């Protein structure tokens, strides 16, 4: 069981790396498709697994971009893990709409709040539209894919969460 879960975590992390390489230019930086595999993992494998994939996915996306924000990416990875974890918990409770809306809003408006203090309000304001677009795209892709992939994942794996 552990080796199967580890293999699935590696698979979703690899999907996250592929998504991180697909970038759409945005106002500040770019929008990547690195989060939707984490949302898939959170819904299919459990919130702990999704959190791991979310943190790794962001770090891989930052690595591909050359870590433009330096050590701030560690904070962002932790934020991403937390947001994906909350998404997974709510999704598991069959609150899919709440999970999706909360993820989009928190990833867009709450996660970049530290940048107000580190950079300035102008940087935060410039970042928000890009994050909103990216969050919506990643969440919609995940919501479309989850029901289709649920039939492919064996029932003994579904929501057998990873302990953090």
Role assignments for model-derived ranges:
Residues 1-164:
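Loop-helix junctions at membrane interfaces
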